[in-house]
């Protein structure tokens, strides 16, 4: 279903997510409650396990198809010389990942994680955030839709990463805006 408004499809998707499996969550919490250990001695891991059980519908929860998705893009703000690295370094890093020689490749091999690297049109940088929004609504929605390809083929744990010259500047600007 496609709408005339850029984010309507995402709003619809979020509004129609399946409900959490509260029975699976309850079973996991019960397992922790009857375990021979001091109360809440595992800290947040108990809450994380219960959350994963609720959203996966499996108690106890299990991660069998983890995936690391790395999104590579170039930012218009780099024209101000904000990084000592040239913009071409992003494409070089993507090529290194594709060849299996990047650090993320080795981490994924060591921990049996799937890896997908997405080139977000490296030849078309976003707008310069010192002058305008990096993406307009349509561009943002299109990029989000492209990003949803990360889960094509299925995954039960999605880890996200970014790659690109200028990313830390844009992240700092977002942080400053939000907080």
Please tell me what each predicted stretch does.
Residues 1-179:
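N-terminal loops that bind phosphate or other acidic moieties
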